[in-house]
Regions:
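Bacterial N-terminal signal peptides that target proteins for export
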Residues: 2-14
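Low-complexity, Pro/Thr/Ser/Gly/Ala-rich linker/spacer regions in secreted
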Residues: 30, 254-264
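Short, charged juxtamembrane terminal tails flanking transmembrane helices
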Residues: 284-288
């Protein structure tokens, strides 16, 4: 991987994120302000995470099903191959007119490095946004990702509107293979390992399965002193199939549950490009 390859991918990804950083489709009602935090728990020399897509919905938005092709789930393929959340953002907005979603950006250029965390605050309606879903690409890879396939897996509010919250860890055994690209792990076709453009991998035409892990001698042994700001980039700690390997932690906390007006149906887009953020990003680097 070289600086140009990494930089080009980061610029393209950041542009896509700016187009769909926050989308809200809530009606005037009682709102709760939530803080959503994702932390990359990978060890030193571990893998990176692309900016995570998160969504609050009524429990009907299905991101994927194991054993099924992503062709049947609009928007997720571009995320699992290239970390691009824009198509998923559009699909969610179309399917969930009362849903609330965001893409969690890091303090600096994407992606989220090992030991780094970032937070967003969002206003949601407990009556229509009881459940939480997430998705992020694990990189470098061809189409490895983490996401919840069960839309009812994370209940944030009960039927009475009481806040339940969430605090959970995604293990390496939960990393999935999108089945859309062959896992050749070649630089030209592997995101953040030298790929110059999106959607350049070899089509696999497969289904979503548990990821078999990265290949020893390719990604797991990659060291390139010119890759990341002139610093060595070593993925020898990126074997997420190792027992007990932790990939990410998600936390959802209640910041405020005061009754207030939520925007009438509409879309708030491009907050990053406009210079305003509803996010309170925090970054913590893992100490060596």
């Amino acid at each position: 991987m070289n600086k140009f390859a990494l930089g080009s991918h980061r610029v393209a990804l950041a542009a896509a994120m700016a187009l769909g950083t926050v989308t809200t489709m809530a009606t005037a009602a009682s709102a709760a302000t939530l803080r959503v935090t994702i932390e990359n728990l990978a060890p030193i020399n571990g893998g990176f995470l692309t900016p995570a897509w998160v969504g609050f919905h009524d429990g009907t938005f299905d991101l994927y099903d194991r054993g099924e092709s992503l062709d049947d789930f609009t928007g997720l393929e571009s995320l699992v191959e290239d970390g691009d959340t824009s198509q998923l953002t559009d699909a969610f907005a179309a399917d969930n007119p009362d849903g609330v979603q965001a893409t969690l950006l890091s303090d600096g250029p994407p992606p989220l490095e090992p030991g780094e965390l970032t937070s967003f605050t969002l206003d949601v309606d407990p009556a229509t946004n009881q459940y939480f879903s997430y998705a992020s690409m694990v990189i470098p890879s061809n189409d490895a990702f983490i996401a919840n396939g069960n839309p009812l897996a994370h209940e944030i509010f009960d039927d009475a509107g009481n806040f339940l919250g969430a605090d959970f860890i995604v293990l390496g055994s939960e990393v999935l293979d999108g089945g859309t690209e062959v896992n050749d792990e070649l630089p030209f076709s592997t995101a953040f390992l030298g790929q110059q453009a999106p959607d350049t991998g070899i089509d696999e035409n497969g289904v979503v399965t548990e990821h078999p892990g990265l290949t020893v001698g390719t990604i797991l042994g990659t060291t390139d002193s010119s890759a990341l700001n002139g610093l060595p980039l070593n993925f020898t700690g990126a074997d997420f199939t190792a027992p007990g390997y932790q990939v990410a932690r998600f936390r959802i906390e209640l910041v405020d549950n005061q009754v207030e007006d939520v925007p009438e149906p509409g879309i708030i887009l491009g907050l990053v490009a406009a210079g305003g953020l509803v996010a309170a990003n925090r970054k913590r680097k893992q100490t060596a």
